[in-house]
Each structure stands twice: as C-alpha cells, then as structure tokens.
C-alpha cells in the first residue's frame, strides 16, 4: 500500500524529510531520521494497533519490563538530533527512544520498549517533544514562580532566595544554613526540580563551607554583596574542594577591580558567568569579553533578548527597582545608565547565534520573566535567521540553529551545574521531564508537561464538560502536582557533602535527592553546540563589540513572533 506524504503525516505524523514550522516563527525543522517502522506504527484508539495481541503484548508484566508510558510517533527536538520515534518511560525515567510495540509479532521493537497491559499511552502524532527546560538564574522571590515556570515548559529551577526579602530581590542567594534548610523544606511542595545557591561573598572559607554542608549546590558571588578579588578567590577554593559550581555577577562600577582583576582571581578554574551581556550587571563596559575564555561558561537573561525597540527604555526603570536604587541619587542613576548599553545588547543576539553565549535563563522577578525563557530563546533564533540568514551546514531547514538554541536552556545549563546525569535532554536513563507541544503553539504554550513520567501540567478545558476540550482551555495543574506524587516525580539537588552528612534525612525530606557532580573539570568546550571562543573586544567609548575583528551589530526589531497574538485568550 502506498500513500502520499501528506496522508501519512496526517495519520502517523511527519517522517524523514518532512518539515515543521515552529509556532509563527520563520524557523523550520526537518526530520532527520524516523525510528518507527512503516506499516507497524503504534497508534492508540478504536480499531488501531495498540490492542491486546496486536501492538500490545498480552503476557508481559510491569515486573518483566513492560513500559509504564509510551509517547508514540513524536518528533523529538533535542541537541542530539531531530528525529521521529516512540519514547518509552519506565519508573519515571526514559528507557528508550526508538520503536515500541509487541516483539512477538513485530520486527524492530526495542527490547526495552515493549507495550503491555500496564502501559499508558500519549499520542505524539504531529507533535513535538522536548526536554524540560533548566533555568539557572532564579531569584526565589515568590513560590508562584514555580507554577509559571512549569507551565512554560521549564522543569528545573536553580538559584537562590528566601522570598521577597530585599537581598533575595536583588541577588540569587539563599544565605546561611538556617535559610537553606527552610527552603529545602519548602521545596517539598512543588512539582519541580530545585537546587539552591548559597551566598559566596566572604573572605573566609568557614561561612561558605557551612552553606555547602547545609545543601547548597553552588555559591553565588554578587556585586551587591561585594564581589572583590578576595571574595572570588575564597569562593573558588571552596567550590573546587566541594565539586560544585559558582555563579558570578561581577563588579559593575569596577570599584574593587577591573575585568582583568576578576580574571586573575578566577584563574583557570571553571565558573558560570551571569549577565554576560552586561545589562544585568558586571564590569562596565567589557564584561562580555569573558565569553572569549575556555574556562568561562557564559549565560544571559531574558530581559535583553531579543533586542527590540523597547529594550532600552524598559531597562532603566527595572534597574532602579531591582537593585534598591534611588532616582534622587545621581550616583544611582549613573550606575543604571552604565549598565544599559545598546551596542552590547545588540551584540548579545549575535553571540548567541554563533554559539559564543552558551545558555539562556530568566533572572526571575529581578529584571527577567520566569515564564519567558523558552519564548525569548526562540525569538532570538527567529530574529537572527531573518537578520543573518542560514547557518553553516543548513540546507533548506533550520536544524543547526534549532539544535543550538534548544541546547541553551536544556543540556548546557544541566551540564554547567552538574545535573546532566539526571535532566537536560531526551536520552535513555534520564528523568522523564518532557514537554509535548502542538507545533502551532511551540515555544509558547505546551500541551503537556511531564515530571518524572507523570503529567504535571496540561492544557485542559472545562472540568464539568462531557469531553476534555470545551472552553475555557488553559494550563491547569494535573495529578503529578498533588499529594506525594510531586515528591516521587521531582528531584531536589544537593551537594555531595550535604548528602553524606545526612541533611535530607535530618530535615525529613521526602523528595528524590540527587547530588550535583562532575563540575570542576568542565570547560566551555563541554557546552553542546555553543562552545565558540571568538576573541571579543569592546570599544570603551562607543561600546561597539568586535569578535575576531568583525563588528557585531544588529538592528532592534519592532515585532517578535510568539508574542501577543498567543495571549489574547
């Protein structure tokens, strides 16, 4: 039997060579490989193939290895590739990406992907599946951020804070062992993975070690607490010993030293630099130079991406609020103006496009929007395609660019903070934190958000309706968000030192606990598809940015895709 590509796609989803548009962007991904078998596709429903004795094996039990969940015929968009496959989940983890079914009557079935009577099905035909996002720049200012982030497709939040305290509104630090314990306890209620950064600003190691042993997955150096060369050196010594990450927000006003002094204090040790663009903070005007160094893992935040006609005006007011500045104090106003530079903000988009900035993150409620990491990452990708054209290696599709940009908020932040053994990609063995998208709504409104293999958020209609689809349809909490299910489907990340000291047990934590690890030997070359090391120079008078001698400049846009048209209802 033969059928047209159009007919096949309508029934079973796109196959090798077919293209899918991402939302209302100008980005098109092309299926590189199809792991399903033509004629033996797994389809659920009346008269379909997932029935007893057909695609469903009638003998295999859960103990024998039957899948708990299969997502059928879905297109995976991951840094590893853009492929069509079935995705198998067992005990909350991904056990296979390939062909599912009943090996008794079918060829090519992955032995780890056998469908049995205990297997649930999510139909992925015509849908896109991605890994849950990892946001590494969270100010834990209000718990409602968790709901917004999860509803956007972000499933892991890393950062610091204790609520709307003045320090937390400005810096991503959960300061001290007592607050670390309380935040670990609070995290029990949320169906999302979390990890907390302690305050890294101290000239002695003891208060830093205390926070690491209390559970901190890393330390945060922030200029508002004094990011001096002494504090940097002390912090770096502690994280090297504990195999955790340090995130740094450098000295905007160059009070305790210049960029070169910070580099000397860091040495050749790996560090995650926040706000590489500078608008969010850091050595003015040349913090962006750090993206040239192999031991620097650079990220930027949602406020400045993509560069639009409104970016400059919006930032000045935000700056005054977020950093507790006074518009009546001339020095505070000058501080704000020193950070908002059009030339470096414009260069930020291009550095993302060439893979020199490795990660995107939110800076939640502290200049950034926690629910817009994914939206804004894809808006930059769209803007760069329109302004810079296709990337090398692309032939009639945007696969190279798509894989580069999805890596910025999935695998690369997971690697940077030592979580990639658990999350960050759609790969065998990882927690099944997965996001299912209708291509029309890609990047904006997920259809389903799975945590540890269970649906935590979904687009759902009127609960009193006779079917799930009647209006109003919007993102609602699902069963993985309730009771003890949120504890068994999510992870609290902690330092190895705190785990060995029994902190989780002493606090009575019930969530899965996992250590961060394999951090201190990282380099930028470990950043997937975002490891470029151009020589970056910045004119101190005009703030023009040059990479390998080429000026990086682009125009602000007055329209972005994935924008207001999606939020009319």
Swiss-Prot record:
Record-linked NCBIfam families: PRK13206.1, PRK13207.1, urease_alph
Question: What EC number(s) has UniProt assigned to this enzyme?
Answer: 3.5.1.5
Provide the taxonomic classification: Bacteria, Bacillati, Bacillota, Bacilli, Bacillales
Per its record, the protein catalyses: urea + 2 H2O + H(+) = hydrogencarbonate + 2 NH4(+)
A Gene Ontology biological process in which this protein takes part is: urea catabolic process
Q: Which residues bind Ni(2+) 1?
A: 137, 139, 220, 363
Residues binding Ni(2+) 2: 220, 249, 275
Q: In its UniProt entry, what is this protein called?
A: Urease subunit alpha
Location of the protein in the cell: Cytoplasm
Instruction: Enumerate the InterPro entries for this protein.
Output: Amidohydro-rel, Metal-dep_hydrolase_composite, Metal_Hydrolase, Urease_alpha_N_dom, Urease_alpha_subunit, Urease_AS, Urease_asu, Urease_asu_c
What's one GO MF term for it?
urease activity
The active site of this protein is located at 323
Supply the source organism for this entry.
Bacillus subtilis (strain 168)
Record SUPFAM superfamilies: Composite domain of metallo-dependent hydrolases (SSF51338), Metallo-dependent hydrolases (SSF51556)
Keywords noted in UniProt: Cytoplasm, Hydrolase, Metal-binding, Nickel
Q: Which residues carry this modification: N6-carboxylysine?
A: 220
Q: In which pathway does it act?
A: Nitrogen metabolism; urea degradation; CO(2) and NH(3) from urea (urease route): step 1/1
């Amino acid at each position: 039997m033969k059928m047209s590509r159009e007919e096949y796609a309508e029934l079973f989803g796109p196959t090798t060579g077919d293209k899918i548009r991402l939302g209302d962007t100008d980005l098109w991904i092309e299926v590189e490989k199809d792991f399903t078998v033509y004629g033996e596709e797994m389809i659920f429903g009346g008269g379909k193939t997932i029935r007893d004795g057909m695609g469903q094996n009638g003998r295999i039990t859960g103990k024998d290895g039957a899948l708990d969940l299969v997502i059928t015929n879905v297109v995976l968009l991951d840094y590893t590739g853009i492929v069509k496959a079935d995705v198998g989940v067992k005990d909350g983890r991904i056990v296979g990406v390939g062909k599912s079914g009943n090996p008794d009557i079918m060829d090519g079935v992955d032995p780890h992907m056998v469908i049995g009577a205990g297997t649930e099905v999510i139909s992925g035909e015509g849908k896109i599946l991605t890994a849950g996002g990892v946001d590494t720049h969270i100010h834990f200012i209000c718990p409602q951020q968790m709901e917004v982030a999860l509803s956007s497709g972000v499933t892991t939040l890393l950062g610091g804070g204790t609520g709307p305290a003045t320090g937390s509104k400005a810096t991503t630090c959960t300061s001290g062992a007592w607050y670390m314990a309380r935040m670990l306890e609070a995290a029990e209620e949320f169906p999302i993975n979390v990890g907390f950064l302690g305050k890294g600003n101290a000239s002695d190691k003891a208060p830093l070690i205390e926070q690491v042993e209390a559970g901190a997955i890393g330390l945060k150096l922030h200029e508002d607490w004094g990011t001096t060369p002494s504090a940097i050196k002390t912090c770096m010594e502690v994280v090297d010993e504990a195999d955790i990450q340090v995130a740094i927000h450098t000295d905007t006003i160059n009070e305790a030293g210049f960029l070169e002094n910070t580099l000397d204090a860091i040495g050749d040790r790996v560090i995650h630099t926040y706000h590489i663009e500078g608008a969010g903070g850091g050595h003015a005007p040349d913090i962006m130079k750090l993206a040239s160094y192999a031991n620097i893992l650079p990220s930027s935040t949602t406020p400045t991406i993509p560069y639009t006609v409104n970016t400059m005006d919006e930032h000045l007011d935000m700056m005054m609020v977020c950093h507790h500045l006074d518009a009546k104090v001339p020095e505070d106003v000058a501080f704000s103006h020193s950070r908002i530079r059009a030339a470096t903000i414009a260069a930020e988009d291009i550095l993302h496009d060439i893979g020199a900035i490795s990660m995107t993150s939110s800076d939640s409620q502290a200049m950034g929007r926690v629910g817009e990491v994914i939206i804004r990452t894809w808006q930059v990708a769209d803007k760069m395609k329109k302004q810079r054209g296709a990337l090398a290696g692309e032939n009639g599709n945007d696969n190279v660019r798509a894989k580069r940009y999805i890596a910025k908020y999935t695998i690369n932040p997971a690697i940077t903070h030592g979580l990639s053994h658990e999350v960050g990609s759609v790969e065998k063995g990882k927690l099944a934190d997965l996001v299912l998208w209708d291509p029309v709504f890609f990047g904006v409104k997920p259809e389903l958000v799975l945590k540890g293999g269970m649906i935590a958020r979904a687009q759902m209609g009127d609960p009193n309706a006779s079917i799930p689809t009647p209006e109003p349809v919007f993102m609602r909490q699902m069963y993985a968000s309730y009771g003890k299910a949120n504890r068994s489907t999510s992870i609290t990340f902690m330092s190895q030192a705190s785990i060995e000291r029994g902190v989780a047990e002493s606090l009575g934590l019930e969530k899965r606990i996992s250590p961060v690890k394999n951090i201190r030997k990282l380099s930028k070359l470990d950043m997937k598809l975002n490891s470029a090391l151009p020589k970056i120079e910045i004119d101190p008078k005009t703030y023009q940015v040059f990479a390998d001698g080429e000026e990086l400049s682009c125009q602000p846009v007055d329209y972005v895709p994935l924008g207001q048209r999606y939020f009319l209802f």
